[in-house]
Amino acid sequence: MLKHISSVFWIVIAITAAAVLWGVISPDSLQNVSQSAQAFITDSFGWYYLLVVSLFVGFCLFLIFSPIGKIKLGKPDEKPEFGLLSWFAMLFSAGMGIGLVFYGAAEPISHYAISSPSGETETPQAFRDALRYTFFHWGLHAWAIYAIVALCIAYFQFRKGAPGLISSTLSPILGDKVNGPIGKAIDCIAVFATVVGVSTSLGLGATQINGGLNYLFGIPNAFIVQLVLIIIVTVLFLLSAWSGLGKGIKYLSNTNMVLAGLLMLFMLVVGPTVLIMNSFTDSIGQYIQNIVQMSFRLTPNDPEKREWINSWTIFYWAWWISWSPFVGIFIARVSRGRTIREFLIGVLVTPCILTFLWFSIFGVSAMDLQQKGAFNVAKLSTETMLFGTLDHYPLTMVTSILALILIAVFFITSADSATFVLGMQTSYGSLNPANSVKLSWGIIQSAMAAVLLYSGGLAALQNTAILAALPFSIVILLMIASLYQSLSKERREIKKAEKLDKPRSPRVKKAY
């Protein structure tokens, strides 16, 4: 195994072990320090996050409509490795995964009944704002962050033959420095953010499955149950990781889409169908109409509303950035053979539509119960809001078990994808990292999630991941500069070659 791994593996293991040890020995101390640091960053650099993430969206749109969009992520005659449906399924599963199920009902309810962006809860305007801001937080901006990182990795790896490392994308502007300490530091930030972000999500996934089992069957909401769940899921995702990308992750992602589609369709039919579709349509219009205002909204003279923006919008932008090395590298790996335009439209548009539909169905179903006084969904914990909502619609047990299976499969695909990406990043960018390396990362992630659930340090570790987003956002800006420089150069070369290949019209001598 040792010959397959780079020094980044050992450096990140040491840093992660130190963070986990701190979380075990003194979780309150880690929580206080990380929370204070996070508060300082959101207060002092909130404007920066809003500007850079909006820049990411703008750059993606520019590339879609630019002639550069015709360039293929691979050799000119290369075909996509995965079919369109499997590709969409893997994008969706890796990009949002557990978060969609965790917050499907919880975020709209929170914006509507607990803490509204407008300040007034449980009003008709709060209802509209709830869905609009949920779309905003999970929409174009989130996927643009992923798309930028994925595009840079895919272009330099499949078009230029560079290793599949974050640092390799900066070679046009940093030169040989990417092979030295600077490159190692960049890769360490990316790997650390991935390990911490995914471990946190695994912990949240275990708590939601446990919350669902407790709500449905009265199984105790306790660490020992969560530990058993983590062990079971770990065995399953390690088996999937061992089987390879083309089998395990692909089949699980396709299964995810089928299960999610069945649950969505059922709830659309038995829920407040007309209200759901009206809200879906209205909220898309509201989202498009207000996207610029929401993208730059800081309310500097209104501390209460600014606190809401810090807690939601800026938190989300930092969280998506901290996840972008993992999701971006995975998306790049499964996108070989597509043009830049096809890639960006696929990554930005399709997941957004599915995400908006998901939140409309489950969010509106929950908010409808709340506004009619049929059930106080807002009183439930975040991890049980989905189950509380399902409890008030037909076939409760069937839909709840389906939701539990969906969470478990998302759990497995997220961890499986992460072990693959971590294996790549610590094996010199290998497209097929050794199983021993993937298994090592799988065990490390699960152990971290279990230890921090036990010590109560999971929230503190989540804050730590978000802190890594600030330096990594600067890395993404450098990646954009590097990519644009390379794409512009290649575009000039293509135009020059086209001119040389263009047949000259024969000269006709004039008769005098």
Swiss-Prot record:
Disulfide bonds: none annotated. Coiled coil: none annotated. It is a multi-pass membrane protein. Keywords: Cell membrane, Membrane, Transmembrane, Transmembrane helix, Transport. The chain crosses the membrane at residues 5-25, 45-65, 82-102, 135-155, 186-206, 222-242, 257-277, 312-332, 343-363, 395-415, 441-461, 464-484. Induction: Induced by high osmolarity. It comes from the Bacteria. High-affinity uptake of glycine betaine. Does not mediate either carnitine or choline uptake. Belongs to the BCCT transporter (TC 2.A.15) family. This is Glycine betaine transporter OpuD. It comes from Bacillus subtilis (strain 168).
